[in-house]
Structure formats: structure tokens, C-alpha cells
Amino acid sequence: MHFTGRTWRPPYEAHSVIIQATSGCTYRKCRFCNLYNHECFRMSPMEEFEEDLAEIKTYQPNARRIFWTGANPFAMSYENLRLRAWTVRDYLIKCQTMAMFSSIRDIKNKEVWQLRKLRAAGINGLSIGTESGDDQTLLLANKGYNSDDIVEQCRKLDEAGIEYYFVYMTGLAGKGNGYRNAVNSARLFSQLNPYFISVDSLTLFPD
């Protein structure tokens, strides 16, 4: 298996088979995150991807769910995502769904019809690090989008039938702003249909 850089998956994907689709992050500007500061975004070459699929087929031929690693594999183009999804299904005929991390920014360049095609190919389970639904907090964290963007892009996922999950981060709004952040985030998330919302806490480390 080819794994480079930081490789991790959310706890709820513990039973999914993992494969590297990308490494690094396309953005690397979130103020609270240093996971990928020194790691440029890279797509795994198809040759590597297929070699890993062949290895998975040998040891876990009945795999039903595959988690693509990397900070945001959904940043890949529609064509690349679709090619890889169908390649997975060529190797793993019992695979039902493929999941991965995504940013709101990654959904913007995809039309609803493209999202439907990706869903038909088996992509169904986007972990989206929204962190907040409060505009002031999103700006402070330098997320690169606002609450309206979250609603607009996730409604596209709803229309396409793609399941998605939110991450909410406590402590991100700064001292004295937690209540405002929580209320505004709850109002925003209630307009959408995340399958679930996981909660993380901001932890500060010295540089």
C-alpha cells in the first residue's frame, strides 16, 4: 500500500478499508490547523491507486466500504473522481460506497448532475470540516467560505442524494463567543440534512 504524509480517518470510518487517493491539503490556510503545513497536495497516480486496489482485492475482496485518505480528495475534478470510483468497483465488486474528506470549497466546482453521477458511481459519505456555521467564527478561522456557501453547496449534495457529515469545533470562536457560535451554527445546520454532526474541541499547541 502506498501511504505518504499524514494518514488518518475519522473514528466512524473505523471499519472501512482505507486507500490513499490524495495526500496533503489544497488549502492549508485554516488558522487552527497545522496538519499539512509542510505537505503539498498530491493526487496518487492511477498506477499506484490500482496497485493498492489489487492488494486490497487480495486480502479483503469482500470490502463493502472504502475510505479515500487525504485532507480533501473531493477537491479532485469530477472526471478524476468518477474514474477512480469506477476503478474501485472494477477491482472490488462488492464495494457499495466510497467515503472521503471534503471542504465546502471542493463542492463549488461541481454541478448537481455531476454529483448525481458520482453518487451513482458509489461516492456516498463526505466528511465536511465546516467547524462552524457562524460567519464571524468562519472568518476568524480563515475557512475561505461563509454560512451562505455552506447552505448552497450542501443543498446540492442533498439534491444529488450524497450523504454528508459535519464537524463542529468548540472553542474556535474565541473567549466569550461560544454561545453565539453554537446558536448560529445550530440554526444553520438545521437548514440542512447532515447524516450526523461530530464535535471536536480546539486544542492549542505551541508553534
Give the location of each predicted region.
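Conserved functional loop/turn residues at catalytic and ligand-binding sites
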Residues: 29, 34, 122, 161, ...
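Conserved, mostly hydrophobic/aromatic
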Residues: 25, 33, 49, 68, ...
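Active-site mouth loops of central-metabolism enzymes
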Residues: 43-46, 101-108, 173-180
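Canonical Radical SAM [4Fe-4S] cluster-binding loop centered on the CxxxCxxC motif
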Residues: 4-48
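Conserved SAM/AdoMet-binding glycine-rich loop
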Residues: 57-159
